[in-house]
Regions:
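N-terminal active-site segment of His-dependent metallophosphoesterases
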Residues: 1-61
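Active-site-proximal beta-strand elements of phosphoester/diester hydrolases
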Residues: 2-13, 111-121, 150-152, 207-213, ...
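Active-site neighborhood of phospho(di)ester-bond hydrolases with catalytic His/Asp-centered motifs
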Residues: 5-7, 42-49, 73-79, 118, ...
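Active-site environment of divalent metal-dependent phosphoester hydrolases
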Residues: 12-15, 52-57, 79-87, 122-125, ...
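Short glycine-enriched, charge-decorated loop/helix-capping segments at active-site entrances
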Residues: 16-22, 92, 162-169, 225-227
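Binuclear metal-dependent phosphoesterase catalytic core
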Residues: 21, 28, 179, 199-269
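His/acidic metal-ligating clusters that form di-metal
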Residues: 30-43, 127-208, 239, 247-248, ...
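Extended active-site neighborhood of metal-dependent phosphoesterases/phosphodiesterases
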Residues: 56-143, 172-186, 205, 227-241, ...
Length: 269
């Protein structure tokens, strides 16, 4: 299975700009590139902060921008989003029995369960995963206890070393990780956004994770700086491949450049 990840698109109302950039135009360029070069993907996931302030017109604008995509989309919520206006613009988005925007998708080859989590809470920058959501996650893990999972969400439930996010990370992340660690089928990968910079790593107990780069703006990495600078970034998305050999995450930066010399076909030894 091939999945495209976008994250932290931060769309604003039509005609507005954010940090001097047009978030909608940037997503439109990404969609055009994905249609031209990744049309064989099975799914596109946006891992939260879809709109910068939960504006209904921003969500409606995104719906129009995404319409050329040949693959289905799963849209997840981040702290900048609003669940009510998002669902008004995307009423077909799957929700759980309590109205949270979270769902599962089961794969046969490879045998995996994809979990899409909702860590948004009104008025809170950090992630919240309340008792109702924890019960939902526990049930989804128990339903197929022998099947490994890949988890998508906005807030990182793992340490990432960015001081700016020390107090606005995933407040209930350890509760989520406790359930995931106990899953007999194991956790193949956790994929998130929120921190706006590309990141990959593995927890001390062996769970791999990665973050995508924000599609509109990112930080100039200053890991110990509580007030790092925002900057523009190359248009980018992540290409996630799930197969019997594992989980592979490739960052694709749309940097305009010309080929110099074509590499030869290296057949070994």
């Amino acid at each position: 299975m091939k999945i495209i990840q976008l994250t932290d698109t931060h769309l604003v109302e039509p005609g507005a700009r954010l940090y001097g950039m047009d978030p909608c135009d940037r997503v439109r360029q990404l969609v055009t590139h994905i249609c031209e070069h990744q049309a064989d993907a099975d799914l596109l996931v946006i891992t939260g902060d879809i709109a910068n302030d939960g504006n209904l017109d921003a969500y409606r604008q995104l719906r129009e921008v995404l319409s050329p995509l040949p693959m289905p989309c799963r849209l997840l919520l981040g702290n900048h989003d609003r669940r009510d206006t998002f669902l008004e613009a995307f009423p077909e988005s799957p929700v759980d029995e309590n109205g949270f925007v979270q769902s599962v998708q089961d794969l046969e080859n490879p045998s995996l369960r994809l979990l899409f989590l909702d860590s948004q809470a009104p008025g809170v920058i950090g992630g919240i995963y309340c008792a109702d959501r924890l019960r939902w996650l526990h049930t989804r893990l128990q339903e197929r206890s022998d099947v490994p999972v890949v988890v998508f969400l906005h807030h990182p439930p793992v340490p990432h070393g960015m001081r700016h996010f020390k107090h606005i990370g995933f407040h209930d992340g350890e509760s989520v990780m406790t359930l995931l660690r106990a899953h007999p089928g194991g956790v193949r990968h956790i994929i998130f956004g929120h921190i706006h910079v590309p990141l990959s790593g593995v927890t001390s107990d062996g769970i791999p994770f990665s973050a995508g780069r924000g599609s509109n703006h990112q930080f100039i990495p200053g890991f110990d700086d509580p007030t790092p600078f925002w900057t523009s970034a190359p248009l980018n998305y992540s290409i996630i491949t799930l197969n019997e050999e594992g989980v592979f995450v490739h960052g694709y930066d749309m940097i305009e450049c010309e080929g110099i010399v074509r590499a030869r076909n290296c057949l070994g030894p």
